[in-house]
A protein has these predicted regions:
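Extracytoplasmic
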Residues: 41-44, 77, 94-98, 126-129, ...
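Extracellular LysM carbohydrate-binding repeats and other cell-envelope/extracellular binding modules
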Residues: 23, 27-28, 35-39, 74-117
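Exported/periplasmic cell-wall-interacting domains
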Residues: 19-22, 178-299
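Solvent-exposed coil/turn segments that connect beta secondary-structure elements
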Residues: 87, 104-106, 137-139, 146-148, ...
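Primarily a LysM-type cell-wall glycan-binding module
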Residues: 26-76
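N-terminal signal peptide c-region/cleavage motif recognized by signal peptidases
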Residues: 11-14
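A structural motif detector for short, solvent-exposed N-terminal "entry" segments of globular domains
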Residues: 114-160
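Cleavable N-terminal signal peptides
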Residues: 5-6, 16
Length: 299
């Protein structure tokens, strides 16, 4: 009986201990949303999942009702934003849980750029056509055009034992699909929209079906959700070579899009919010004053 009880406890504990990953369909809809971008970021607050009955279903219903300003369906739709902010998806919330969300329900409907941990303007990159930043501390990435933020999203870098190298890179060769060489025998790890930044070590930005929300677990590459990887593939440029743009063979004649990798791998959940004088505040990613002065990371 004791053995059976132990097995039951393990079976129920395993899902709770498992690493969560982003719902890529939900994020794809959010990241591609065209909506107003206010001059200042929204204020945030701690939202509580609670109901006098203690019932989690009723507590979630109350949360939806509050977020939707009385419209439960709208509130459920708005709560999808929790995933972009790295919070627990609404359907998994239980009584007693808390999550950080915009303080005003109307601020759930803004442009995804409004929720970015990155500055809207990067003066140091104002003369650079396109620049990409990967921040390991927050496990996010961002794209800038002439110093203006145009896209951002979640990312998952290398684990502490196989870290993504920091420094300045440029995009090299690229491939629409590629199988990872890190896959165990008999397994097939397919990557799409592969954009290499370190040829010698095989470090890429790429799409992957599993992008963890917690500590990074990769082998050095930068995992991205499908919508972001596809966007970045179309927006960025690989190197120019005598064999063609972004080709694996040939002699390089011009570098591709600039990529800066910075920060430190988090031990636990990535840093997303900090305590401010009036409540939680979005963490602010600091960017280098001169990205071209950042030491190269591929040497």
């Amino acid at each position: 009986m004791r053995t059976l009880l132990l097995l039951v406890l393990v079976a129920f504990a395993a899902p709770a201990l498992a690493q969560r990953s982003y719902d890529q369909d939900v994020l794809g809809a959010l990241l591609g949303r065209e909506a107003p971008l206010p001059a200042a970021p929204p204020a945030y607050a701690v939202w509580h999942v609670e109901h006098e009955s203690g019932n989690s279903i009723l507590a979630r219903h109350a949360l939806y009702e509050r977020a939707g300003e009385g419209d439960v369906a709208l509130g459920r739709e708005r709560l999808a934003l929790a995933q972009l902010l790295g919070e627990t998806e609404a359907g998994l919330l239980r009584t007693g849980d808390t999550l950080v969300l915009p303080a005003r329900p109307a601020d759930f409907d803004l442009s995804p750029l409004a929720y970015a941990p990155y500055p809207r303007e990067w003066p140091g990159a104002a003369e650079i056509d396109k620049a990409v930043v990967v921040d390991k501390t927050t496990q996010t990435w961002a794209g800038y055009e002439r110093g203006r933020l145009v896209r951002w999203g979640p990312a998952s870098t290398g684990a502490a034992e196989t870290p993504t190298p920091s420094g300045r890179f440029t995009m090299n060769w690229r491939a629409l699909e590629r199988e990872s060489s890190e896959a165990p025998p008999g397994e097939r790890w397919l990557m799409r929209y592969v954009m290499n930044i370190h040829a010698a070590r095989g470090i890429h930005l790429h799409q992957y079906d599993v992008v963890p929300t917690g500590p990074p677990q990769g082998h050095g590459c930068i995992r991205m959700v499908t919508s972001d990887a596809e966007w970045l593939w179309g927006w960025s440029d690989g190197w120019q070579t005598t064999a063609g743009p972004g080709a694996l063979g040939g002699r390089p004649t011009a570098p591709g899009t600039l990529v800066i990798v910075q920060g430190e791998e988090p031990d636990g959940a990535p840093l997303r919010f900090v305590d401010g004088p009036n409540g939680p505040e979005r963490v602010a990613v600091m960017l280098p004053p001169d990205p071209l002065a950042v030491p190269r990371g591929d040497r």
